[in-house]
């Protein structure tokens, strides 16, 4: 199996692309079903990790939507610091809106917890997390 070296780390393929694409399709199908007929939801991607996932996901969404991104920092290298900082915040109006946070993976849960608290303080109609 081919390995890729990035800086001082070696990586090998864990999940083939086809399985990832299938999973994204299943997630999109569920979102399409759950949000059919609702007012335009706001998808909020957590950079940098969610960028490609969100791109592939949005291509499969069958209703009008709005996109935004935030950038958070909670790591020093590959280690969690336990402290989440907003580098790029959410500037969109949230009150009364359906919001879907898009994250590539949930590791410690600290970034997602930070996002949920920030959204709840802004009174969305609903809030959900979509993660690969």
Predicted regions and their residues:
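PRPP-associated nucleotide enzymes
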Residues: 1-132
């Amino acid at each position: 199996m081919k390995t890729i070296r990035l800086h001082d780390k070696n990586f090998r393929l864990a999940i083939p692309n086809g399985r990832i694409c299938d999973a994204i399709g299943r997630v999109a199908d569920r979102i399409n079903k759950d949000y059919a007929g609702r007012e335009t939801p706001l998808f909020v991607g957590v950079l940098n990790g969610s960028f490609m996932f969100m791109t592939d996901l949005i291509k499969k969404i069958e209703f009008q939507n709005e996109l935004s991104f935030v950038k958070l920092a909670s790591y020093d290298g590959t280690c969690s610091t336990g402290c989440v900082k907003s580098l790029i915040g959410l500037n969109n109006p949230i009150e009364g809106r359906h919001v879907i946070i898009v994250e590539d993976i949930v590791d410690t849960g600290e970034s997602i917890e930070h996002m949920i608290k920030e959204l709840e303080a802004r009174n969305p109609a609903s809030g959900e997390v979509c993660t690969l």
